[in-house]
UniProtKB/Swiss-Prot annotation:
HAMAP family noted in UniProt: Rel_fac_2
Organism: Mycobacterium sp. (strain KMS)
First-listed, main subcellular location of the protein, grouped into a coarse class: cytoplasm
PTM (free text): Methylated by PrmC. Methylation increases the termination efficiency of RF2.
Name of this protein: Peptide chain release factor 2
Main function: Peptide chain release factor 2 directs the termination of translation in response to the peptide chain termination codons UGA and UAA.
One of the record's GO molecular function terms: translation release factor activity, codon specific
InterPro entries: PCRF (IPR005139), Pep_chain_release_fac_I (IPR000352), Pep_chain_release_fac_I_sf (IPR045853), PrfB (IPR004374)
Alphabetically ordered keywords of this record: Cytoplasm, Methylation, Protein biosynthesis
N5-methylglutamine modified-residue sites: Q253
Gene Ontology cellular component annotations, sorted alphabetically: cytoplasm
Length: 371
């Protein structure tokens, strides 16, 4: 085998060994065994919230172990592919060598993607995520853009078999949404999606403009970790104002004949959370409370970071303003303004193919935090 190819394979094997060590593959197997025992308990579904958490964590752990084991097998198979190519002659040898090179390149990409998972070591990175999208400047185009972003993230979650729970959708009058809040129920969803926080900019020919003029629209994305009991985010009833109303759909159309939608106002901070997608008022209140607790946790951590930055004489780093540009006209390009990562296929990106942006963002964040 070519010495350069041997060196490439050895480097990939070493990287994968590091990934296996960081992920604690043996511990992962033990965790799967315990979760399987818990999932087999016939009484588990008496607590649906707990059952969903167990099954989601089990599925994620099984998929993670399967990915690592498949990568290890592919690393071990790669030298065999090159040996088989060396035994061929003429065009067959050339074709077999090209196939081995293609597998080497693909394996490098897949191992690097798995390596990114080991970078998710922040305090809340392993949590599930609550995502809120709000339309910004740009009128009806911005509302349509906010809905396109919501679809993009939901499609991404679906492609990874991550359950999504929509808490609230506030529809705009003509098209699109004013805002939406949903949860992605998967381990490490917060650590992965938190790099999406910021302002997303769309440039396109407006489908709502009779003169087909180019329009720039903005939408803001907020990503929060789901709060757990260990976070001790207690909200006394005396700090809440609870309003109920009828759920509404696109164009303000009522979709419920009872006052099941809930709006929570946290009086001390002025934070407002609404939820209307559950069937009952109680379910909507519980869901709204989960989102409110996530926002209060984020506010608490933001205040702590601000105090630390003040002590350090550091203005702090903000994700605010533009972080990614999606250009559909006059050319086609999606570019992250922090990482410089770009893709010339906006249709695929808007259909949920954002793993490249997520991986680049996670690496960028870790480099920034190390500086």
């Amino acid at each position: 085998m070519d010495p350069d190819r041997q060196a490439d394979i050895a480097a990939l094997a070493a990287t994968l060994t590091t990934v296996e060590r960081v992920l604690d593959v043996d511990g992962l197997r033990d965790r799967i065994q315990k979760l399987e025992q818990e999932a087999s308990d016939p009484n588990l579904w008496d607590d649906q919230s707990r059952a969903q958490k167990v099954t989601s964590e089990l599925s994620h752990a099984q998929n993670e172990l399967r990915r690592v084991e498949e990568l290890r097998q592919r690393v071990e198979d790669l030298p065999v592919l090159y040996e088989m190519a060396a035994e061929e002659e003429g065009q067959d040898a050339e074709n077999a060598g090209a196939e081995a090179d293609a597998e080497l390149a693909k394996l490098r990409v897949d191992i690097e993607a798995m390596e990114v998972r080991t970078l998710l070591s922040g305090e809340y990175d392993e949590r599930e995520a609550v995502v809120t999208i709000r339309s910004g400047a740009g009128g009806v185009d911005a509302a349509d853009w906010a809905e396109m972003l919501m679809r993009m993230y939901i499609r991404w979650a679906e492609q990874h078999d991550y359950p999504v729970e929509v808490f609230d959708t506030s529809y705009a009058e003509e098209a699109g949404i004013k805002s939406a809040t949903f949860a992605v129920h998967a381990p490490y969803a917060y650590g992965t999606l938190s790099v999406e926080q910021g302002t997303h900019r769309l440039v396109r020919i407006s489908p709502f403009d009779n003169q087909s003029r180019r329009q720039t629209s903005f939408a803001d994305v907020e990503v929060l970790p789901v709060v757990e009991t260990t976070d001790h985010i207690d909200v006394p009833e005396t700090d809440l104002r609870v309003d109920v109303y009828r759920s509404s759909g696109p164009g303000g159309q009522s979709v419920n004949t009872t006052d099941s939608a809930v709006r929570l106002t946290h009086i001390p901070t002025g934070i407002v959370v609404t939820c209307q997608n559950e069937k009952s008022q109680l379910q909507n209140k519980v869901a709204a409370m989960r989102v409110l607790q996530a926002k209060l946790l984020a506010r608490k951590k933001q205040e702590e970071r601000a105090e630390l930055d003040a002590l350090k004489g550091d203005g702090g780093s903000s994700w605010g303003n533009q972080m990614r540009s999606y250009v559909l006209h006059p050319y086609q390009m999606v570019k992250d303004l922090r990482t410089e990562y770009e893709v010339g296929n906006p249709s695929a990106v808007l259909d949920g193919d954002i793993d490249g942006f997520l991986e680049a963002g996670i690496r960028w964040r870790n480099r920034r935090d190390d500086d």
